[in-house]
Amino acid sequence: RTIALALAQNGWDVVVHYARSAAEAQATVADIIALGQGAIALQCDLNDEAAVKTLLDRAAAQLGPISCVVNNASLFDYDSATDFSTATLDAHMHTNLVAPILLAQALHRATPEGAQAVVVNLLDQKLFNLNPDFLSYTLSKAALQSATTMLAQALAPKVRVVGVAPGITLVSGDQSEAEFQRAHKVTPLGRSSTPDDIAHAVRFVIEAQAMTGTTLLVDGGQHLIPLQRDVMFVTS
């Protein structure tokens, strides 16, 4: 929501994708329209390959040509090496890797010769500071980071592909607000990322026409502090 509103404030018309949160998506659309920009909400199950492949065409049919895709949707379920299953990995890979690749492919196909579009993939600071928690999620995001580089190579010059890697930003799982606040401060800067920080970074990489195939860390330096567990488990 924060990213969508920030882009609207910067003059973008916005397609708000949702899987199940229709009311929240429509509320975001209403707020964007109130800012004077065009907006629609489109439902799509990111595990449905056929639906993902048509999502950009559906968006363009209602709002006009698409020149930017922000892959922010993410599956974030807990597992570890001791309870790993192929079903859990497959679910994470479909949402966190396959869907972003298909959307980048569709954007490249829709971008005319001589024009340039951009894909922004939301990653995670833990790729630069590994721990054993959230195994399937981490593997899927690590694959997306590699895909960010490979897509940037393959889809240039029509499409730039850039990663943004935030730190802990919102309450995760069964964290209490107090636990989140403690975890949020475990950085060299004394704070991790906020939704506004991430939105600002996304706006920056969209406008930075010389950036592609790289990842911008926006985490207050969280990746510089090694932890044995995921930062969401920090309680003291």
Language-model features, listed with the residues they occupy:
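Canonical Rossmann dinucleotide-binding motif of NAD(H)/NADP(H)-dependent dehydrogenases/reductases
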Residues: 1-15
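Conserved Rossmann-fold SDR core element
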Residues: 7, 145, 155-169, 211-218
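The beta1-alpha1 cofactor-binding region of Rossmann-like NAD(H)/NADP(H)-dependent oxidoreductases
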Residues: 22, 43-55, 86, 196-197
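Catalytic loop of short-chain dehydrogenase/reductase
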Residues: 75, 112, 116-156, 168-169, ...
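Substrate-binding pocket helix/loop in short-chain dehydrogenase/reductase
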Residues: 80-81, 85-93, 183
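A conserved structural motif in NAD(P)-dependent oxidoreductases
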Residues: 187-198
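C-terminal substrate-recognition "lid" of short-chain dehydrogenase/reductases
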Residues: 196-218, 223-224
